[in-house]
UniProtKB/Swiss-Prot annotation:
GO terms for biological process: intracellular protein transmembrane transport; protein targeting; protein transport by the Sec complex. It comes from Streptomyces lividans. The lineage of its organism: Bacteria, Bacillati, Actinomycetota, Actinomycetes, Kitasatosporales. Gene3D superfamilies: SecY subunit domain. The chain crosses the membrane at residues 19-39, 69-89, 122-142, 157-177, 189-209, 219-239, 275-295, 318-338, 378-398, 400-420. It is found in: Cell membrane. Belongs to the SecY/SEC61-alpha family. Component of the Sec protein translocase complex. Heterotrimer consisting of SecY, SecE and SecG subunits. The heterotrimers can form oligomers, although 1 heterotrimer is thought to be able to translocate proteins. Interacts with the ribosome. Interacts with SecDF, and other proteins may be involved. Interacts with SecA. It is a multi-pass membrane protein. One of its GO terms (cellular component) is plasma membrane. This is Protein translocase subunit SecY.
Length: 437
């Protein structure tokens, strides 16, 4: 398999892109260890050691920052503000006609939407940075740590402002690094950085499981988790590649003396058309009420109920609500990201039709019917995969931050497949055989 990658490094321009991407990744990983002023890192390290994998509410964000969040470094916020901004803009595109018109304007419209995404990313970085600093100052960032209140010794406003500015600047640098990879490297830059952030948390999480294990000095638990992870990766690859192909034929047209059309193709409808977005939506929504309770420090009945039933990932109400939110958002996101009427109109415009289905509205209804049928198993699969860490925690007493969680595996497999396909296509353009055999 490794020899199949040799042509990628033998091709000068492709080798240059790969090395450039690796260089940016190294810079990004170095940035996750650069400290910001105003933080006592001895106390931070002590709290991280005491947490021992129990990162509570901040586990998801910490994963997307490659472990930099709980270290409170320059890249503490990672790419989470950009992900959130991109999702918000994508949703607003459906609601606001002006944004929808920009989306249809081609490259110029896409550039404008990208600019809006950058502005929103900076605003969200300021907001999230302020929240993180306030949480660290109050001692709530590490629940149960004896020195959590001493992480930020200087409580002055100026120190807080400097910390927020450093984190916001770090987010802007991360966004810039991602765009550099997209323009001059291999793959989608933000997706690559997300992939690296998640993969960077695996070694420490796996080692924590080994240290906490009891059978054969923890090696049996360690091996079991690796085996479960490999099985999950295989399952996710299988489902992510699964698709329903709708056959499409194009009628022959004579333009001058030339004949056009008469070809057959298909519309690929993936089983998991929504990707990982529903999981991120559901996690973010369940994150909000628990965060409100943590900031309020209230002991009222409503706060106790939220802490017991929503903040606790092993609680039955949390599991049920999380599963149904994922299913709901899967249908919701598919509905806004795939427009059957638009696809049917484009097919009709260029003389395409589905055999046995009339062009126009009947085609749109047929596409909508098929999409709804395949979204059901896709949404149920997403819900079950996302609940793997919870099931591992409840059934086997596993580490709360089970490294092969649904969100992380979905992102790693999705980004990995997309990047490999891009390298494969570039190799085939240069008359190489490729390595996907």
């Amino acid at each position: 398999m490794l020899t199949a990658f040799a042509p990628a490094f033998k091709t000068p321009d492709l080798r240059k892109k790969l090395l450039f991407t690796l260089g940016i990744i190294v810079v990004y990983r170095l940035g996750t260890h650069i400290p910001i002023p105003g933080v006592d890192y001895k106390n931070v390290q002590e709290c991280v050691d005491q947490a021992s994998g129990n990162q509570g509410l901040f586990g998801l964000v910490n994963m997307f920052s490659g472990g930099a969040l709980l270290q409170i470094t320059v890249f503490a916020l990672g790419i989470m503000p950009y992900i959130t901004a991109s999702i918000i803009l994508q949703l607003l595109t459906v609601v606001i006609p002006r944004l929808e018109a920009l989306k249809k304007e081609g490259q110029a419209g896409t550039a404008k939407i990208t600019q809006y995404t950058r502005y929103l990313t900076v605003a969200l970085a300021i907001l999230q940075g302020t929240g993180l600093v306030a949480t660290a100052r109050s001692g709530a960032l590490f629940s149960g740590c004896t020195v959590a209140g001493q992480i930020v010794p200087d409580q002055a406003i100026f120190t807080t402002v400097v910390m927020v500015i450093c984190m916001t600047a770090g987010t802007c640098v991360v966004m810039w690094l991602g765009e550099l990879i997209t323009d001059r490297g291999i793959g989608n830059g933000m997706s690559i950085l997300m992939f690296i952030s998640i993969a960077a948390t695996f070694p420490s999480a796996l080692w924590a499981i080994k240290k906490q294990g009891e059978l054969a000095d923890g090696w049996i638990e360690f091996g079991t988790v690796i085996l479960v992870g490999l099985v999950m990766v295989g399952l996710v690859v299988f489902v992510e590649q699964a698709q329903r192909r709708i056959p499409v034929q194009y009628a022959k047209r004579m333009i001058g003396r030339r004949s056009y059309g008469g070809t057959s193709t298909y519309i690929p409808l993936k089983v998991n058309q929504a990707g990982v977005i529903p999981v991120i939506f559901a996690s973010s929504l369940l994150y909000i009420p628990a965060l409100i309770v943590q900031f309020s420090n209230s002991t009222a009945g409503w706060a106790t109920w939220i802490t017991k039933n929503l903040a606790d990932t092993a609680a039955t109400p949390h599991i049920i609500l999380y599963f149904f939110l994922i299913v709901f958002f899967a249908f919701f996101y598919v509905a806004i990201s795939f427009n059957p009427e638009e696809v049917a109109d484009n097919m009709k415009k260029y003389g395409g039709f589905i055999p046995g289905i009339r062009a126009g509205r009947p085609t749109a209804e047929y596409l909508s019917y098929v999409l709804n049928r395949i979204t059901w198993p896709g949404s149920l699969y997403l819900g079950l995969i996302a609940l793997v860490p919870t099931m591992a925690l409840a059934g086997f007493g596993a580490n709360q931050n089970f490294p092969f969680g649904g969100t992380s595996i979905l992102i790693i497999v999705g980004v990995g497949l997309e990047t490999v396909k891009q390298i494969e296509s570039q190799l085939q353009q240069r008359n190489y055989e490729g390595f996907l055999r």
